[in-house]
Amino acid sequence: MKFLLLPPAVILFFAAFVITGCSTANKTASKKDWVPLFNGKDINDWIVKIQQHDAGVNFGNTFRVANNTIQVRYDEYGPEFKEQFGHLYYKTPFSYYHLKLEYRFVGEWVKTAPTYTLRNSGVMFHSQSPYSMPKEQDWPISVEMQFLGGLSDGKPRPTGNMCSPGTEVMQKDSLVPSHCINSTSKTYDGEQWVSAELIVLGDSLITHIINGDTVLQYSKPQIGGAVVNRYDPAIKKDGQLLSSGFIALQSEGQPVDFRNIRIKDLSGQYKSKQAKL
């Protein structure tokens, strides 16, 4: 059998072609892995739950859509905020995933809201269902990736923190006693868009990422602790690990915009690895 010897230049050309083709295929597959949770047009795939109102009631048109963003506004609330804290839940729960979104604080804070809500919002995850919350319950039993905006006073105010309404988490093999853990992020003043990412591996490791930088990690999210009121006692089973739950965007007195909300399912990748351990 005779073999055809090709010039080195020709071999390099075909090798580059194959590598480029594989790279393009991988990038295409990677892009397809990301699923948008917000279509830029409406919130039909989302469920509103606002304190003092039943699930599904978008009181005061709190959550609305404009310019391909979910906008949180309070202009129809009247003179008093009355602690009508709200959350906008995606319709299905998740367990192992990588969530990406962008947010920005805009406009005037509602002065009748609690002072801690100034330039404050967040995304709740591993949350109880909105339909399991009594009308008067303030926060869902969940874990929060808290978003804070700088106050333009030169003082640090990190974002991408962790807060734990009705939950607890672990760091260095110990339960964290505080309600919130500050991240190592920079401070973001004004109305600039900030990119936030959340990597959730069931009831194992949780990672917070802000503008591409890993700013916080912890593990073993579980039900426990306080800072949640008027809940159904049957739901709050202290010590129960949280391996899945709903994702929700927060409204608590500060106008905020959300956009480019998308998710990548990691369950196939990580559950199979854990099963082999």
Give residue ranges: language-model regions.
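Bacterial Sec-dependent N-terminal signal peptides
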Residues: M1-S30
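Carbohydrate-interacting regions of secretory-pathway proteins
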Residues: C22-L277
